[in-house]
Swiss-Prot record:
It comes from Streptomyces griseus subsp. griseus (strain JCM 4626 / CBS 651.72 / NBRC 13350 / KCC S-0626 / ISP 5235). Keywords: Repressor, Stress response, Transcription, Transcription regulation. The keyword Methyltransferase does not apply. This is Heat-inducible transcription repressor HrcA. Belongs to the HrcA family.
Amino acid sequence: MLSERRLEVLRAIVQDYVGTEEPVGSKALTERHRLGVSPATVRNDMAVLEDEGFIAQPHTSAGRIPTDKGYRLFVDKLAGVKPLSSPERRAIQNFMDGAVDLDDVVGRTVRLLAQLTRQVAVVQYPSLTRSTVRHVELLALAPARLMLVLITDTGRVEQRMIDCPAPFGEASLADLRARLNSRVVGRRFADVPQLVQELPESFDSEDRGTVSTVLSTLLETLVEETEERLMIGGTSNLTRFGHDFPVMIRPVLEALEEQVVLLKLLGEATDSGMTVRIGHENAHEGLNSTSVVAVGYGSGDEAVAKLGVVGPTRMDYPGTMGAVRAVARYVGQILAES
């Protein structure tokens, strides 16, 4: 167990290295921080930190830099989440308030996260498997042709054309619309099949074929749209950190091009709290020199998707965690109000 003083030395090393991009020496630490001890004592503390794997000495420098283990201890024990300033919060709100639909919300969120953190931003679209139904609309386009419009609690809109086996009157259409909404509004998509399975039997025999066709189209829409989607932005930010990657930046870029890799990264994040994965904690080899900060977002208490950033392990963790958390909250508010 590290003493409080050595934890403070580690905190100072992380802060200085993140801020200066240069390995940190004992003399610089005592000059920049009020550690209350001599450079010789700090050197001894740094030797202990190095022996225990929290810092390391690059072969080109006499200073020390944090290891993945050091960053992990910093995040778990020493780093608080840095709140955004009032101007930053107002800027976020003004930028996000202009969104007109879900695609625009996701696109703006990606750009905002990338600008705030100067990292690569990744935003997952709300998953229909976690969403609930806000409304189902049925519109008559012709006597035997309908349009089904499905609206989710996250503002997602899906449209399908339906060719009916027989003409379907306005009264029957209004009846089906009302009965369908009474059963499924506010319910999770996973529950919908069971909720509507007996609905055709409650209609006259001449309408049952059309009702069954409408329900089949609705359920097929749920299956088709369960594929996860995401948006990525700010990849060019990585070019500013070329020296942070031990070999080359290409493996990182290649990993970021694989949607399956990114979906797995976000999938490993918890729904409720902040998830920070550092260096080799990331299973994908191409991301072993990066850190991932992610959190769930949603229109209520339950997360419907996740968002986060990917950057070098030499990251401003308090500031990044604060930005990711704040943006997630604003997106959740927009979805709830939309």
